[in-house]
Design a protein with these regions (language model features):
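Beta-rich carbohydrate-recognition modules and glycan-binding surfaces
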Residues: 1-144
Length: 144
């Protein structure tokens, strides 16, 4: 099976990806669940170090609150393995990671967003303000 993933790369601290959620009332949900993984073959991820990002919610009055997915929690881990090359006779080369890279299932409790109106969320931001660069693959972001 082929898994479709959204690849997000950043090259400076402070980048942001904004999107409008499919629903606006988050008040009946317990968590924001993110399924993501580091793209280890990209040098923008520091070898051996976990990544850290923030998830920000913005309500319809423009009030916002962000929660960090901390590198100390090791939720977005740098996987074991190494980058290898496969050389072909025609001169072409393929670089690949030699180990399976697991997807991290990260849950952010909705109670951490206590200073905004969870019944009226108009925007979600993924903020890349904790590391200077990185490359993540996202499978899903949802409320549950």
């Amino acid at each position: 099976n082929i898994l479709e993933l959204l690849n997000i790369k950043w090259e400076y601290k402070g980048g942001k990806l904004s999107f409008k959620p499919d629903i606006s009332d988050f008040s009946e949900f317990n968590n924001i669940t993110i399924n993501t993984m580091i793209c280890p073959a990209n040098e923008s991820n520091v070898k051996g170090r976990a990544q850290s990002i923030c998830i920000e919610l913005v309500d319809n009055k423009g009030k916002s609150e962000k929660v960090e997915i901390s590198k100390e929690s090791n939720l977005i881990n740098y996987p074991k393995g190494k980058l290898e090359n496969l050389d072909f006779e025609n001169g072409k080369e393929i670089k690949f990671w030699n180990q399976v890279t697991p997807i991290s299932n990260i849950r952010i409790p909705m109670v951490l967003y206590n200073d905004i109106d969870l019944k009226n969320i108009k925007k979600c931001n993924i903020i890349f303000d904790r590391t200077n660069s990185g490359d993540l693959l996202f499978e899903s972001i949802m409320v549950d």
